[in-house]
Design a protein with these regions (language model features):
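Short amphipathic alpha-helix with an adjacent loop that forms part of the alpha/beta core around
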Residues: 166-172
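Beta-alpha junction/loop-to-helix N-cap segments that form part of ligand/metal-binding clefts
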Residues: 1, 13-86, 157-162
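A short acidic, amphipathic alpha-helical/loop segment
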Residues: 62-66, 139, 167
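A generic secondary-structure signal
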Residues: 9, 13, 41, 111-116, ...
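Conserved donor sugar-nucleotide recognition element shared by glycan-biosynthetic enzymes
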Residues: 31-35, 59, 102-106, 133-136, ...
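Hydrophobic alpha-helical segments typical of transmembrane helices
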Residues: 2, 6, 38, 108-109, ...
């Protein structure tokens, strides 16, 4: 990975202040409860000086109270929930994001549908068990309607669903 290559390069050049960098990995199984346990071990036992990850917003949300309490910076490479870096209007001091947010994605999708695809009537199928999916659908709907588009159908499903006939029949 790019991180490993960068660490190798720094270490070959003598490290930082003569100290070699090391990567400590931990699998949180993309489960918030596991993420909390995983980051607790990284911070309290492995004594890491920074955390890169987790991948999902839910896992980052479970990790940030632990990293923040221990003043360990956490870089969220792909957690897109708006409250990852800001909560109640206040910037979280030890949490950083290196990607866009859910509202940005929903807006860009609607703008693309309007400008590039010239779509005016839209049906939305979203995962009601996912804050990510619900957030995208909400912002997409708002932006599309502001641009004069019409949401002709909005149907929810659950991630565990295997049959989408009912929702698709309603949209048709």
């Amino acid at each position: 990975s790019g991180l490993k290559m960068a660490f190798d390069e720094v270490n070959k050049a003598g490290g930082i202040d003569g100290k070699k960098l090391r990567i400590v990995e931990s699998d949180n199984k993309s489960e918030p409860s596991e993420a909390g346990n995983s980051v607790t071990k990284l911070v309290t036992q492995d004594k890491v000086i920074a955390v890169v990850g987790p991948a999902t917003s839910g896992c980052v949300a479970a990790s940030t109270p632990i990293t923040t309490a221990n003043k360990v910076p956490l870089i969220a490479p792909c957690a897109t929930a708006p409250n990852i870096t800001v909560e109640n209007g206040k910037v979280k001091e030890f949490v950083f994001r290196s990607c866009f947010t859910d509202p940005f994605q929903g807006r860009v999708m609607a703008e693309f549908a309007d400008k590039n695809l010239k779509v005016k009537n839209v049906a939305i199928l979203y995962d009601a068990s996912s804050d990510y999916s619900k957030g995208l659908a909400e912002v997409f709907t708002k932006t599309m309607e502001e641009k004069g588009g019409k949401i002709v159908a909005k149907e929810a499903f659950l991630a565990k669903d295997l049959d989408f006939k009912s929702a698709l029949t309603k949209i048709k």
